[in-house]
Amino acid sequence: MASFISLSSKSASWNASSCPHPSVQPFVTRKNVVRYHKPTSSEPSYSPLTTTLSSNLNSQFMQVYETLKSELIHDPLFEFDDDSRQWVERMIDYTVPGGKMVRGYSVVDSYQLLKGEELTEEEAFLACALGWCTEWFQAFILLHDDMMDGSHTRRGQPCWFRLPEVGAVAINDGVLLRNHVHRILKKHFQGKAYYVHLVDLFNETEFQTISGQMIDTISRLAGQKELSKYSMSLNRRIVQYKGAYYSCYLPIACALLMFGENLDDYVQVKDILVELGMYYQIQNDYLDTFGDPNVFGKTGTDIEECKCSWLIAKALELANEEQKKILSENYGIKDPAKVAKVKEIYHALNLKGAYEDYETNLYENSMKAIKAHPSIAVQAVLKSCLEKMYKGHK
């Protein structure tokens, strides 16, 4: 095997007194330490399919989650009573974990690949805590996105705001989730040299993401009046800002900062990651219509909500005048019969094939750019990111 990351199969020996964070127990000890095997000169370059964490990661990652959640619901900055504490705990459990946790895992994955040697207990804890910050951030984004879209399900269960006892309270809950990120950062990273850069990174990413959400929302107002306003360039702008920065760039940038790097030195890496992040969002557009809700845990509403998705933008690019007329008459209307007519046009234009062509070209171009980077460790990080997303619809 060219490269691997593994955790000892021996169970960790818990010793709270030796933990760099006295309030929690360590989940990685010196006897159960993350190790990284450097390829020798005779070995091939990193194989992204083998740079994965051990099967123990999920349970260890969740242990850190429980620690962070406990800290938040006992935050001395607010005087919790039983009702408020139970509400916040339930809300966190409902909205933060439960997905694939790709962003959170990517922080840990990437930091290990960059360091290239065993992690200390503190490093392992901090990498997971930072990973959870990206998951908390996503929960905030998704909670508000679901409300704005009028979505019904998320990750195979009703959206948080759809619960009878929640409703509009979810607006405040979303803001609370966003504030939790800063509470975690302050508690565990304030003394680090890169703390201010982490805060800036999350603040800038939030601005880009909610600005992208704004474009997505107001473009629908124009599209409802005149569908021809939609284009591939508009879709690209939406997916770049609404999802690419926080989905792909944020986790890797967190790992780079924790490793002591200056993000200004990684402009090329940022460009690659933003392109991959856009691919991730376009993949979501594809799955919204062509994915199985039972598999992906979400009922698609892009057609009904008149979104400027990759599919409608591509359809308008390929359609003849008659097909464009049908799309204009039926797109953006909450009527199953009209949604079906839009999907008929999608199938007639072979948008599945168009998406697969885009996906193949994206993979080839991204891999070429990744291999051009001078650092093998950075190549491994980028390849791992690409492989996690590639053909996620299969």
Swiss-Prot record:
PROSITE patterns: POLYPRENYL_SYNTHASE_1. A motif (DDXXD motif) lies at residues 145-149. The keyword Transferase applies. Dimethylallyl diphosphate binds at residues 154, 242, 281, 298, 307. Mg(2+) 2 binds at residues 145, 149. Mg(2+) 1 binds at residues 145, 149. It comes from the Eukaryota. Pfam families: polyprenyl_synt. Its EC number is 2.5.1.67, 2.5.1.1, 2.5.1.69. This is Monoterpene synthase FDS-5, chloroplastic.
